[in-house]
Amino acid sequence: MNRIAILSNAGSGRNARKAALIESFGGLTAVYQEVTRSAVDLPRALEALLARNPSVLAINGGDGTVHAVLTALGDRPAPPLAVLPAGSTNMTAHDLRCGGRLSRRRRALLALRDLPAETWPTLSRSPLALRCPDGRELRGFFFGMGMIVRGIEYWHASLRHGGGAGEWAAGAALLRVALGMLRREAPFDTPVQLPAVLDGDPLPPAPKSLFLASTMQRLFLGMTPFWGREAGPLACTWLSDRPQGLGWRLPALLSGRARFLPATAGFFSRRGETLSLTVEEPWVIDGEAYTDEGTLTLGAAPPQTFVALAGPGPGAKGAK
């Protein structure tokens, strides 16, 4: 029987609201769970789970929990990972074909105990590898500055609690920030000074209202705001200080329809291998805010195998 290791973040959105999922794993055959209640618990919990030599390591939490586990793992050997979408937005889980109803993903995870590993639906993804000015390396899937930070701040202040969790709430926060930019309301219209170099080529030095970089195929609500055609795993999109026609171009931006997003109007998107940024303001990776100032270097980490608990789909293999 395959052994399943589960790292559960008791503070993640759905887990914090209802502890039933965490409790449901107790006493199950070939299931080993460690529960964390703060960031300092994670290294010990991860070591305890890996010592079990599991067939799969499931992350029961949200985007920030996945980011924390990937960062803690670094480049060390690890079993295939799976994600139980127990956070508030669960953007990472959706992109890794682990999104949807939590009860169904739980059943799919537990079913792996009796299924040959070669039949599991899996996909291979390269997380972001972000090196901080002090030498620390973070792992995740999504980096953002500018209106991305403003949107997350607004979401935390106004929408996070009660019925405000989920992808739709994140979308509402993004629309609120876009409206604030159109109305030129502070702080939503505050641009960032962000000197950047992509694969040795300096980006335009003008202030940017938005900057994002990701190795994901889709963001929350299925958004794909990338249209660069260069080679490279790192997709980067940014907007000028005053992008022209943002209101009517917003649907095209969220779906990456290049013909409606000319650079002359302040819309840019490129792909590459290595991105260097000089930051003086807060930035986020997978929804977690950081205030480190200085030079950040972003690239793609080695590919990691994930089990697609929602079943096979584009980019997944197995379970035929």
Task: Please identify what each model-predicted range represents.
Residues 13-17, 150, 219-221:
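Short N-terminal binding/cap micro-motifs at the start of the first secondary-structure element
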Residues 64-65, 211, 287:
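Conserved Motif II region of HX4D acyltransferases
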Residues 144, 148, 212-226, 289:
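Glycine-rich phosphate/pyrophosphate-binding beta-alpha loops
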Residues 198-205, 222-320:
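ATP/nucleoside-binding phosphotransfer catalytic cores, i.e., glycine-rich phosphate-binding loops
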Residues 1-60, 65-75, 102-114, 314, ...:
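ATP/NTP phosphate-donor binding region
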Residues 8-10, 86, 241:
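Cofactor-binding loop segments of dinucleotide-utilizing enzymes, especially the Rossmann-like FAD-
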Residues 5, 36, 75-207:
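Catalytic core of DAGKc-family lipid kinases
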